[in-house]
Swiss-Prot record:
Name listed for the protein in its UniProt record: Imidazole glycerol phosphate synthase subunit HisF
Enzyme Commission number(s) from the entry: 4.3.2.10
Subcellular location: Cytoplasm
Chain segments annotated as coiled-coil in the UniProt record: none
Coarse class of the protein's main subcellular location: cytoplasm
GO BP term, example: L-histidine biosynthetic process
Leading EC class: lyase
Protein's organism: Lactococcus lactis subsp. lactis (strain IL1403) (Streptococcus lactis)
GO molecular-function terms, A-Z: imidazoleglycerol-phosphate synthase activity; lyase activity
Effect of residue 32 to S: In strain: IL1403
Amino acid sequence: MLTKRIIPCLDIKNGKVVKGINFVGLREIGDPVELAKIYEEQCADEIVFLDITASFEEREIIGELIGRAARELSIPLTVGGGIRSIDDFRRILARGADKVSVNSAAIENPELIRQAANEFGVQCVVVAIDAKKRADHRGYDVYIKGGRENAGLDLVDWAKKCERLGAGEILLTSMDKDGTKTGYDLEMLNDVCTAVNIPVVASGGCGKISDIVEVFQNTRSDAALFASLFHYGEATVDEVKDELIKNNIPARIIKKETL
């Protein structure tokens, strides 16, 4: 059985890590590269950098930040935010990122997914999807522009289309759960995990270690992504991995040498 991945997510605004509740009320946390290095030391499997305002304000991701992170990290780095073209993919990968996450532009131009997969390989293409439960509780709507605009797409339909176009992975965020620390949206995750055959990364709502255990025990999610739990020092990646192992959930661990 493949090991489950633990992925700290660093939401970046103006070059600093921030975190808010339901995509608003942002507060600054710290330097993204320094935080990423700490998480790698704690046995994180990957790191995600998301420029959460780039798409809305039409700003480009700061290349220097990506390059610095890529030089100082040995684990995979995914970068997203403000991705609009195949040139953006090319530029970010050239800076040293391992994967590129695309959200708004993939909906506006779905062929971008196919083009990127053909040129760089499906392993480099992550489609980030922000979704919110409909008022009638019958399914989920997809949102773009940092969660500010309803894209008019059904979540499951869009996820399946992303897979057909060549996405190698889906990063699925529950807008209802994001920042609330009330646990992942298991229903939403199950809807998508059963509809596609590519890896799904669970995001939005993690507040305690047991939430991570729960998402792996109750969904087919391949990875869990979270921010608040780590950024505020409420838990470490090591502690999460230990709890997964205790619950017979496969996870990568590094045996530390004893003096």
